Amino acid sequence: MKILTKLWTNLINKITNKKYLAAVSGGPDSMAMLNMYKRNISVVCHVNYHKRESADRDQEIVVDFCKKNNLPIEILDVDEKVYEKYAHIDNFQAKARLIRYDFFKEIGKKYNIQHLYIAHNFDDFLETAYMQRARQSKALFYGIKESNVVNGMIVKRPVLFICKQTLQRYCDENKIKYGIDETNELDIYERNRVRKTISNWSLNEVYDFKKAVLKYNKEHSSFANFVELSYIEFKKNKYRYDYFVRQDDGVQYYLIYYFLIDQKISNPNENKIISLIKFFGKQINKEKAYRVQENLYIHVNEDDLISLISYDKNDVIDDPNIIEKQAGN
């Protein structure tokens, strides 16, 4: 449709002159985004995990587009050496996310670019919000933000409120090649099951759900802003324990959560965070540390800073998650 093409043109005209990296998988979402915003994209980033039969096909699609449009491209071939570096992360989705964002950061430094385009769409927004609500997550924001900072990069999601079907139709109408990820149909992944559930909703159900999510986000926005400022201060002070302990439990929860994320501890769960709040009681014992990952523990060091420390063998005490720190550590 010509009207649809005009819509994309109008969107592009509103963009600033900033230059971006673009994360492009080869699927319809990222290929549509790549074509819409190619004037603002300095470098395309593609990650090949070599975990599905169509992986090389998708890489070829992205490479061909970049050649035709004179766009520089950086490719990460994830081999066993790369996977070994992230072997401490059991969940593949969490591992893959960390691998690609570390890659984006590396390429950003290489080209001196701090902004990154990601092609999350409205379907992704709904699926994420659905899973968060189903888990009764304590997240202060349901869904996916249009812009945030990830691994030191400013991430923009320019097609977030465009549905996947519309993006695929855009590719078809503009004769842009794309690949379909065959694993999207596998029920072994929670997101795929959620996707099938939402696909059966009526337009009214989608509207009502979106309305409820936006209401939740608005109601929590003030506290979310306060937490964000508190964490900035916490980080600025090198994670001082005395700053942490002065906050109430609600703020402490998110200070720990963001600290663990910054330290690349994948998917810290609610029970772990609540246990850490109890561990960091007002009478903290500096001789003890709490396990947050295999052989990796959190503690208060001699400078009264909350930090991580590694151990291979330790004496487990009352709680199997807690160890007595060895002399000299």
What are the residue ranges of the model-derived segments?
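Glycine-rich loops and low-complexity Gly/Arg-rich segments
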Residues: 67-72, 98-102, 140-145, 203-206, ...
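ATP-dependent adenylation/nucleotidyltransferase module used to activate substrates
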Residues: 1-131, 165-166, 173
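AMP-forming adenylation/ATP pyrophosphatase catalytic core
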Residues: 3-18, 148-150, 217-329
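Proline- and acidic/polar-enriched loop/turn elements at helix boundaries
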Residues: 35, 47, 78, 160, ...
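Flexible helical/loop "lid" subdomain adjacent to adenine-nucleotide binding pockets
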Residues: 119, 123-265
